[in-house]
Amino acid sequence: MHVFGDIWQNHAERIAANWDAVVKPEDTVLVCGDHSWAIKFEDAAADLDYIAARPGSKILIRGNHDYWWRRESTNRIQSQLPESMRLLHGRGLVIEGVGVAGTRGWRVEFDQDLDAGDEKVMKRELMYLERGLSEIPAEVESRIVMLHYPPFDADLEPNAFAQILRSHKVDILVYGHIHGGFKMEGDVDGIDYRLVSVDHTGFAPVRIV
């Protein structure tokens, strides 16, 4: 990662030190994608072992660089991970009264119109988000959504993902992908937007709830 700038020097060591210093075994950590550069699951072992070695339970969603995690292989990969790591792909779950749904989303930073391939992926990701949120029972204390891509375009205009967040009365959105440049944080239409890309958070976990 250091090829992307000096800020990334020793990033793995810094993340580990900061994570280990504040996360307790009973905590749950939401990790919003781009876990490994590997193409195949077998080649991602070292990166996944690194995440597994950190304290706490972890919930992972796919990022745009996670080629090792193909959507149709989610169950197979999950079966080979430790119990402390949960792959969340278009599903919803409840942790200590808090509902969590997650999916990758789709690209937003390009000015050109989406082509047919983009439209297909976009519709699928929207369906995953809708499904995941629908699996969260009504009586939860709050609803958190994990996305890799943010739910707005390069002009900071909300897209169809944001509409789903509003319709399901999501309380908190955590997202990644953005490294500098455009971003939205804080109260957006009653939803607390949190950008959690590690270079934005100082390579340290941030408390969500």
Question: PLM ranges: what are they?
Answer:
Residues 13-17, 94-96, 117-123, 134, ...:
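Binuclear metal-dependent phosphoesterase catalytic core
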Residues 22, 66-156:
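Conserved catalytic scaffold of divalent metal-dependent phosphoesterases
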Residues 42-49, 74-78, 156-166:
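Charged helix-capping and loop-helix junction motifs
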